[in-house]
Amino acid sequence: MTQKLLSINDLSILLPTGADRQYAVEDIGLELHAGETVCVVGESGSGKSLTARAVMGLLPAPHVRVDKGEIIFGDEDITKVSYERLRGLRGSEISMIFQEPMTALNPVMTIGDQIDEIFRYHVSMTAKERAKKALSLLVDVNLPDPAKIIDAYPHELSGGQRQRSMIAMALALGPKILIADEPTTALDVTTQAQILQLIKDMQKRLDTGVLFITHDFGVVADIADRVVVMQDGKIVETGTAKQVLQTPTHPYTKSLIAAIPR
């Protein structure tokens, strides 16, 4: 068995008073191992993205917060560590790529400067070493003309180029876990396939555990080792990708699979 990287146990995330339900997620549990892709699948409002944000310590507290349960990374419970420790974990141990990189990237900094900032915060390197490493990362994610892109601003790039840049930043420090929150939703079909392949290739090279958040079982079929299906904040089905895709048991899972374009 490969190394267990993450264990979520009996996690409940409380919503503000007046929300349509008490908990965004309720009593959920899942595990992620090195070199494995676990897809968390569900429609909007299922709680899948808030689960991912809880792992990163990015819940919009105090309005949305962990009410009970634990998120174990290594020998630490992420729900109980200090803000300083969370900042240290983000990027170096656990990284995240988002659905729309235009909102995640800084619009007034070049791609190179944004990668450089990661190294300046986390690693002791000279400016020359940082610049060389940044360029190497852009080469790794198959960006055309990386020497030009390193000096470009986000608005000067295509959607696919921005997402590749985000992946380069997310993997800059060799994290053990990559959380991908619907990273291909805003992309055309061809670019989506390229980004999924890139994530698979990088994962294989780095032995990263990937927690992939999606509403699309077409993506699941392409990338998942194991699947967790969420509906209204609860896990309704879980299993290997083959089990869930070929012999789903829950009506909600069946309806999501039926929505895959043939």
Each model region followed by its residue ranges:
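Conserved ABC ATPase signature
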Residues: 152-157, 161
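A short, surface-exposed alpha-helical micro-motif characterized by mixed small hydrophobic
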Residues: 220-222
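ABC ATPase "signature
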Residues: 238-239, 247
